[in-house]
Amino acid sequence: MAGDLPPGRWSALLVGAWWPARPDAPMAGVTYWRKAAQLKRNEANDLRNERSLLAVNQGRTADDLLERYWRGEQRLATIAHQCEVKSDQSEQVADAVNYLRDRLTEIAQSGNQQINQILAGKGPIEAKVAAVNAVIEQSNAMADHVGATAMSNIIDATQRVFDETIGGDAHTWLRDHGVSLDTPARPRPVTAEDMTSMTANSPAGSPFGAAPSAPSHSTTTSGPPTAPTPTSPFGTAPMVLSSSSTSSGPPTAPTPTSPFGTAPMPPGPPPPGTVSPPLPPSAPAVGVGGPSVPAAGMPPAAAAATAPLSPQSLGQSFTTGMTTGTPAAAGAQALSAGALHAATEPLPPPAPPPTTPTVTTPTVATATTAGIPHIPDSAPTPSPAPIAPPTTDNASAMTPIAPMVANGPPASPAPPAAAPAGPLPAYGADLRPPVTTPPATPPTPTGPISGAAVTPSSPAAGGSLMSPVVNKSTAPATTQAQPSNPTPPLASATAAATTGAAAGDTSRRAAEQQRLRRILDTVARQEPGLSWAAGLRDNGQTTLLVTDLASGWIPPHIRLPAHITLLEPAPRRRHATVTDLLGTTTVAAAHHPHGYLSQPDPDTPALTGDRTARIAPTIDELGPTLVETVRRHDTLPPIAQAVVVAATRNYGVPDNETDLLHHKTTEIHQAVLTTYPNHDIATVVDWMLLAAINALIAGDQSGANYHLAWAIAAISTRRSR
């Protein structure tokens, strides 16, 4: 029971045991996790852009680097999705608590009005006490109902966070952290002495809106006083705010107890300036006002002073690990430690940046010294800030890298031309002043600057990110660009055309990659538990969509975008992956079971290509072939044997038989997905045949031909084995 009860003398008795505090922590968690999700999205987009720029490279090193960037992008996208789930469920918790407070306020207002009317009426005190207790009992019952509903919503929100992050049971976790899920104890009935004392004394400190009332004789107990503990807003058991709440810290004020009931009253809001102790990184936070979502509270200010692991540092360490050859991007190892650990692991304090030596420049006399005001040509340009080398990260074991010098040391200024001395030059002599050649700039080292070993799977630090194949093609252009050999106009035009073609190819590949990803996400949202892949074939003219269910068969309930092609029915290898089924492609995208899926956007393709995509070689005598295949397949339900004849001969199928056939199809559908990827091919064949029968009932001859052709191909695959 919080200290901000609804107004009214009897509010504590009416709704006090169910009254929660304001959901400030969940509301702060909504904003915090939403911003964290956006940061992770931006980092994933940055990695996607870098991967698109590197797509022009060839070779094992380039493929390995692209794979690492892709894994990092998927990991960041998963973390962003988890942050969004935490934000949404924190908002659900806050809404549940706010709704509970509103309903309890209405119940308290109605109960106070009824009790005041009872007390203002005429009659013996015993009758008034009985009527007041009846109103309190009725209000307690309504408060118990709305409190149970709010608790159920909070538990559901907590469970959703567990399902998307670390797994576990919300009920067990809440009980382990001291939250009582039982019905709170109701206050004891009011006596005549209690009513007399409350009506006679109405000071400001009473839980009914007055001063502390004198406790009745029935509440006085003997024995040493026990230390009060804060209670759960939905129960009487003590509520553990964090796993470190019993450790050393500032002492808390004693908790005042209610004169009615057994539940102690927690103190009111803390005084201004009070800083709550920070929660440990691994302990989920329980917000005030009900059990909140794990880790949904915003990190306290005390924890922010320890330089938490920010998305910028994660992205920088990941990129540094890629370019310096550290295996598997050692700077991003915090990502693989779990979503909670990656979001809260602190970094060591940064080292002070090194001082940059100042370079003195010779003083040149200007017109200002002669009394003429000097007007600069442009605004003064600020000097570039010194680049601080990254410090050693103890948590991620990242090797420090010395800053690279983009240019050589500054050339010494040329001395001014000396005044002519001696006789004037003869007629026709060279009047140009002598030119002092500046010292040659030492070449910039191209090898690894730090002491980190350069693995064969990553480019050397400071070196080019282009593969050897691309470097060979651009080597003549680099050689011709040297000052010693003048560049012919034709060679310059050729180099410019080559550069433009490479940039255009990279942009085209990036656009196609995004288009394939949108197609893949649109289809995978309907069955996220399957593996999907999409790619471009025939020099970018055909968009192929595949899944490894029965070596390429697309289930009937999957709606397809327009302008895509599916695999033709044919016997194929049993355990072929989606990559194997896709074959040779120019650009491809893949979805793994229960992987990250982006939210629909305005560019999401419309699902209008079902009948145009599901095509297969025409089967002669489709109806008789389907009837014969169904009869030979004895594992089908009996309803299929009865319906297939009526469907092929257009006799008409009753609605109850159609519904029963759909029900059997759904059961087989669930059985296949439960055992996927180790599904039984015979069960999938049953699904194909039922899909063909349903297509005939719906008048889709092309769809029935497609599903029957796949069933025949799957049966041939079983026999060949």
Swiss-Prot record:
Positions with biased composition (Low complexity): 202-224, 232-250, 419-429, 491-505
Biased composition (Polar residues): 470-484
One GO-annotated biological process of the protein: symbiont-mediated perturbation of host innate immune response
Pfam family, one: DUF5631
Ranges where the record places region Disordered: 196-291, 370-513
Source organism superkingdom: Bacteria
Positions with biased composition (Pro residues): 264-283, 379-389, 435-446
Protein name in UniProt: Uncharacterized protein Rv2082
